[in-house]
């Protein structure tokens, strides 16, 4: 079962508060996980060893999901190069395979979002804290819509990742939208009730610049999350204890969130589409909980 199997309509968010709604939905899942996995109630004190083990586990889960999503992108890259970037004569079977890999990209990105939001909830970083940090750390950036924090952070993260990537000029030229190619060929035969188009948008615009930028952006997420982990000094084997520098710890987690939103921006997602794939995967997880999967 995956997000495509969920037929429940995605809630319409009219005020732009997608991030707040994601926090709400994630807390509903956590409340179940507290009972199933015997997790502590949120928020937690980050200093005890048990808390730090849990935090490091969550950061590892985020990184694992991102790696799985990137693995699908590597497969798309191989198929695209094999088929001359989908120009001229190309294999329709390979195009269908690429579309299936695109769907998995969205699934894994939604999973990464779940784990990072769960981590932020546990360490008591709220949406308003992220907005406050953005305002203080990016004072030269004009915020267009304070209510839509995801879109704001996507804009900032995406711009920073694009600016920081050294891409050759010739790599900026040719891109191909794999989803559009697929729909032009197979669109008339698709059952719209079983083809959730929003699950195929992430990474559908293929090009060297986009994929190289995404790979670099992934490292930025991993870097900030691992630097945050490094502030957690109370290893299970240590007999002495150290207080956590919580300001610097939380700063790195928020920077990791900004970089993750930059990744999603590079993939062509916006706040509405990200919420769509998050919600569908949220419902998959809720089904698994209720069915004792």
Residue spans for each PLM region:
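Flexible "arm" and connector segments at domain edges
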Residues: 2-293
């Amino acid at each position: 079962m995956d997000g495509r199997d969920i037929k429940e309509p995605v809630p319409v968010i009219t005020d732009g508060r997608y991030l707040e709604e994601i926090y709400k939905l994630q807390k509903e899942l956590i409340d179940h996980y507290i009972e199933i996995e015997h997790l502590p109630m949120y928020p937690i004190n980050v200093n005890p060893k048990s808390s730090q083990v849990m935090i490091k586990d969550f950061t590892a889960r985020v990184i694992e999901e991102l790696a799985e999503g990137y693995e699908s992108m590597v497969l798309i890259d191989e198929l695209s190069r094999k088929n001359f970037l989908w120009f001229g004569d190309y294999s329709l079977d390979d195009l269908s395979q690429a579309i299936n890999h695109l769907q998995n990209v969205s699934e894994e990105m939604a999973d990464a979002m779940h784990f990072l939001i769960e981590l932020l909830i546990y360490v008591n970083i709220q949406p308003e804290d992220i907005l406050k940090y953005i305002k203080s750390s990016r004072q030269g950036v004009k915020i267009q819509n304070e209510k839509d924090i995801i879109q704001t952070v996507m804009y900032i993260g995406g711009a920073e990742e694009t600016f920081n990537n050294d891409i050759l000029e010739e790599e900026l030229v040719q891109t191909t939208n794999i989803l559009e190619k697929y729909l032009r060929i197979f669109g008339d035969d698709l059952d719209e009730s079983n083809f959730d188009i929003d699950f195929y948008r992430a990474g559908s615009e293929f090009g060297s610049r986009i994929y190289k930028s995404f790979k670099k952006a992934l490292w930025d997420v991993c870097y900030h999350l691992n630097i945050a982990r490094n502030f957690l000094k109370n290893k299970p084997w240590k007999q002495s204890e150290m207080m956590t520098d919580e300001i610097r710890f939380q700063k790195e987690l928020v920077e990791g969130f900004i970089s993750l939103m930059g990744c999603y921006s590079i993939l062509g997602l916006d706040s509405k589409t990200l919420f769509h794939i998050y919600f569908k995967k949220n419902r998959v997880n809720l089904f698994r909980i209720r069915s004792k999967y």
